[in-house]
Amino acid sequence: MSNDTSPGTSSVDSKSSDPSYGVPGHSHSDKDLLKLSLGAIGIVFGDIGTSPLYALKECFKGHHQLPVDDFHIYGLVSLIFWTMGLVVTVKYVMFIMKADNKGEGGSMSLLSLIIRGANPKLSRWLIVLGVFATALFYGDSMITPAMSVLSAVEGLTVIEPSFDSWVPPVSVVILIGLFCIQARGTESVGRLFGPIMLVYFATLAILGAFNIITRSPAILLALNPYYAIHFFASDPLQGFWALGSVVLSVTGAEALYADMGHFGRQPISLGWYWVVFPALTLNYLGQCALLSADHEAIANPFYFLAPDFLRVPLIILATFAAVIASQAVITGAFSVTQQAIQLGYIPRLRVNHTSASTVGQIYIPSVNWVLMFMVMVLIAMFKNSTNLANAYGIAVTGTMFITSCMMGVLVHRVWHWKAWQSIPLVSFFLLIDGAFFLSNVTKIPEGGWFPLLVGFVVFTMLMTWSRGRHLMAERMRQVAMPIQLFIRSAAASAVRIPGTAIFLTPEDDGVPHALLHNLKHNKILHERVILLTVKIEDVPYVDPHYRASMSSLEDGFYRLIVRYGFMEEPDVPLALNKIEQSGPMLRMDDTSFFISRQTLIPSTHTSMAIWREKLFAWMLRNSESATEFFKLPSNRVVELGSQIELVGSNGK
């Protein structure tokens, strides 16, 4: 629960069946549909759209190199085509994108959807899966900008091989510039993303079709799944290893689901079916037609698709596409972080709005600078896209596998599918995802360790924060005085002064620490005392008409509950202003806010390992204050400190 006494956001309440929660689904006119599809092409498909820069090349030059001959060329392009068809089209577009949480997608949204009403044991395992998928996403958010920009800038070596040493520093300059402009927002230039990516995908399609026609029209036969099956049947071990590079063709598939709340399922599907999938297919086929005619083009088949005089413009266009793909991942990291803060897995962080008119345009400084630092580390460590490709696939395939696991729970518990319906379909997805993941496990020594390390570090921090908050809330419930007892005893004899005091409290049935400290030290109570609890629900948005509910207790005490969805930013003064308009009792110019700031003290009875307790204490100290997080007027806030000792059941 996001409040003064709890360092994170509120415990999630299940209100999905209440019509007051959530927002209507997406419905669009034809004009709006085209605009949203163009926007989706610019944001959602940036990552998967830059895959042709490196995916096919890595199949032949990567971890397990393959001979450049027609057998492998036809087999691999057939495998890439059917991977895109099965993973992106069937799994994500036709199936997973139907699993929206009031229009929102992504791991956190799916997690909040499937744990509703689940028994505690199942919930714990689901939370572990969902949080680990989120942790892997942060590793992917570090690798994608480095991989995309390095691959684009490596086009310089096609023009002049001696430019090879310039690729890392040029990539660093481009990415530092990208991270530095985040604070200003990208709304103005963001309008150009769709048109630029549309030109980029058109270029992919034209170059691919040109090479198919002029080099080897027979490559179209590779659309027959026979070639993919024959490739595997001839050498199953070699086929298994190849999956580790083939999966690079679908990096970014998770973005279709994660960004569904911004554009809607229909515009994303339209963009995939009519623009992105055909363009990618033609480009991969074109690269393979080129390789079939000229095996030496494997050095960089993407750029060799273009005639000499078009390579510089293609490098510029590909670099723009790589920057847009990187921007989409950075924005996604901000969005996922905001959701995790609201759902109580990450401490309160400073969140800045970069647009007064567009919802969701946010900037989180701490996340931005950590991502930038880690991207620079990656470029310094791996130096080129071939080396970095070894680190890329494992985070992507791990997230895909976990999403399939959670979907299995969804179709059984939420959609109530019969076993004969759900088991074959989910097993099919798990088989595909599992094969891709295991193939990438072989890359762990060459770079796959990096996203796993990042994932485990982030997972540990998220679970430590969640566990620490739970223990803190448990301890505060143990020592809290019932509000009715407080009103009848201490409050009845206190001196009352004019005005309104609002005390933020994590629970809606106890006396907040700040109220007890205020009465103990100041010996007074205000004429009106409001106990305010901010609750984050398990839906993306809460209907503003049901935002706040106030009930009278007795003797000038009131209970106020303000609700937000996990995609919303709490703005307490704005919510109180709505109440003020409905009656004269609450006037902001006559109101003071009292909040409590906890300090964790060492405990010999803690149920957390000592290193986790110290980690939680550090995160607690560095979390943003409730004043900033809830947008309280700083000149009307009184902050009172308190100490707390974690206790709880045994366990680590």
Swiss-Prot record:
One of its GO terms (molecular function) is potassium ion transmembrane transporter activity. Residues 1-20 have a biased composition (Low complexity). InterPro entries: K+_transporter (IPR003855), K_trans_C (IPR053952), K_trans_N (IPR053951), Kup (IPR023051). The gene is kup. It catalyses: K(+)(in) + H(+)(in) = K(+)(out) + H(+)(out). Residues 1-26 are annotated as: Disordered. It comes from the Bacteria. GO terms for cellular component: plasma membrane. Belongs to the HAK/KUP transporter (TC 2.A.72) family. This is Probable potassium transport system protein Kup. It is a multi-pass membrane protein. The keyword Hydrolase does not apply. It is found in: Cell inner membrane. Transport of potassium into the cell. Likely operates as a K(+):H(+) symporter. Keywords: Cell inner membrane, Cell membrane, Ion transport, Membrane, Potassium, Potassium transport, Symport, Transmembrane, Transmembrane helix, Transport. The chain crosses the membrane at residues 36-56, 76-96, 125-145, 161-181, 193-213, 228-248, 270-290, 314-334, 362-382, 391-411, 419-439, 444-464. Pfam families: K_trans, K_trans_C.
